UniProtKB/Swiss-Prot annotation:
Cofactor: L-ascorbate; Fe(2+)
Class in the EC hierarchy, top level: oxidoreductase
Swiss-Prot/TrEMBL catalytic activity: a (2R,3S,4S)-leucoanthocyanidin + 2-oxoglutarate + O2 = a 4-H-anthocyanidin with a 3-hydroxy group + succinate + CO2 + 2 H2O
Residues the entry annotates as binding Fe cation: H235, D237, H291
Protein name in UniProt: Anthocyanin synthase
Enzyme nomenclature, EC number: 1.14.20.4
Chain positions recorded as 2-oxoglutarate binding sites: N218, Y219, Y220, R301, I302, S303
Organism: Actinidia chinensis var. chinensis (Chinese soft-hair kiwi)
GO biological process, one term: anthocyanin-containing compound biosynthetic process
The keyword Membrane appears for this protein: no
Cofactor binding, per record: Binds 1 ascorbate molecule per subunit. Binds 1 Fe(2+) ion per subunit.
Residues annotated for substrate binding in this entry: Y145, K216, T236, E309, K344
Gene3D superfamilies registered for this protein in UniProt: B-lactam Antibiotic, Isopenicillin N Synthase, Chain
Length: 355
């Protein structure tokens, strides 16, 4: 049995004592067969596992170690498009501060969080929100979120940043700055992996001035019927790179070789996705992998996704000339980042309308 409730926060639904989730949250029948118990899925040792890449030697003076690290990164980006990265250079205590600040924000009452509510109708996408049923299926996801631009500093709107807890702004700001430095290192290594100059990919996605870091804190409340719902439906990221921190509760699944693979919770790691932007620039040599988020009955899951995105209109995304040949013609038409986002939304609406 399912209930019908629309226009409320998922957290409010979850804490109301419902035993059946509203029908808007129930996934289509063809998806339900692949949704399992995430804790059981995480324990599985057989089958493919998301690669873990040690970045300690990413910029090592020792050429042999550096080359080995770059090769492992390239292999993961080529074969998977996602990896767990360790020894990434971001202080563990800073990651803990970010986790604590985000959790404390979401531990406030819904009424308190509503002070930061976004308003898609008026174009204010930053702030506290939930998925709107604005697609052809009317489908909803079992999550609330907080979304805001965190870097560069001069493009931030501090009026929307949480004032409580007091460490939210300093911790998140420092974390964003560290991630921006890590993005440069990763983009350099990925450039070299394509036979390009090391600064090339960063330049193509906007450079130090224009590459934007957008943070989305995903809050997945406990779900009474996790076998029927998804926290985030299957998608690829439009970004260049995405870095994900989480609270060590499993949920992320990757669609690899025709099957859903659960990412294990690796201590002190970040999950890093290659996004569509890098897939396009590399002419498909680096992969943007399809992924989704499962929910559970027992534990709240929180993840901090930071999307490194090019400017929406200034840059034309297309395969770089060096990645194209007679044998490997361009796989993607030229588009701005905004056009790529629009194309994905339009295509999804078309697919839903055809069902």
């Amino acid at each position: 049995m399912v209930a019908t409730v629309v226009g409320t926060r998922v957290e409010s639904l979850a804490s109301s004592g419902i035993e059946a989730i509203p029908k808007e949250y129930v996934r289509p029948q063809e998806e339900l067969t692949s949704i399992g118990n995430i804790f059981e899925e995480e324990k599985k040792e057989n089958g493919p596992q998301v690669p873990t890449i040690d970045l300690e030697d990413l910029v090592s003076e020792d050429e042999e170690k550096r080359v080995r690290c770059h090769e492992e990164l390239k292999r993961a980006a080529t074969e998977w498009g996602v990896m767990q990265v360790v020894n990434h250079g971001i202080p563990i205590e800073l990651m803990e501060r970010v986790r604590a600040a985000g959790a404390e924000f979401f531990n406030q009452s819904v009424e308190e969080k509503e002070k930061y509510a976004n308003d898609h109708a008026s174009g204010n996408i930053q702030g506290y929100g939930s998925k709107l049923a604005n697609n052809a299926s009317g489908q909803l996801e079992w999550e609330d979120y907080f979304f805001h631009l965190v870097y560069p500093e001069d493009k931030r709107d501090m009026s929307i940043w949480p004032k409580t807890p007091s460490d939210y702004i300093p911790a998140t700001s420092a974390y964003a700055e560290h991630l921006r430095g890590l993005a440069t290192k990763i983009l350099s290594a990925l450039s070299l992996g394509l036979g390009l100059e090391e600064g090339r990919l960063e330049k193509e996605v906007g450079g130090m001035e224009e590459l934007l870091l957008q943070m989305k804190i995903n809050y997945y409340p406990k779900c009474p019927q996790p076998e029927l719902a998804l926290g985030v439906e299957a998608h690829t990221d439009v970004s260049a790179l995405t870095f994900i921190l989480h609270n060590m509760v499993p949920g992320l699944q990757l669609f690899y070789e025709g099957k859903w693979v659960t990412a294990k919770c690796v201590p002190d790691s970040l999950v890093m996705h290659i996004g569509d932007t890098i897939e396009i620039l590399s002419n498909g040599k680096y992969k943007s992998i399809l992924h989704r988020g499962l929910v559970n009955k027992e534990k709240v899951r929180i993840s901090w996704a930071v999307f490194c995105e090019p400017p929406k209109e200034k840059i034309i995304l297309k395969p770089l000339p060096e990645t194209v040949s007679e044998a490997e013609p361009p796989l993607y038409p030229p588009r701005t980042f905004a056009q790529h986002i629009h194309h994905k939304l339009f295509r999804k609406t078309q697919e839903l309308g055809a069902k």
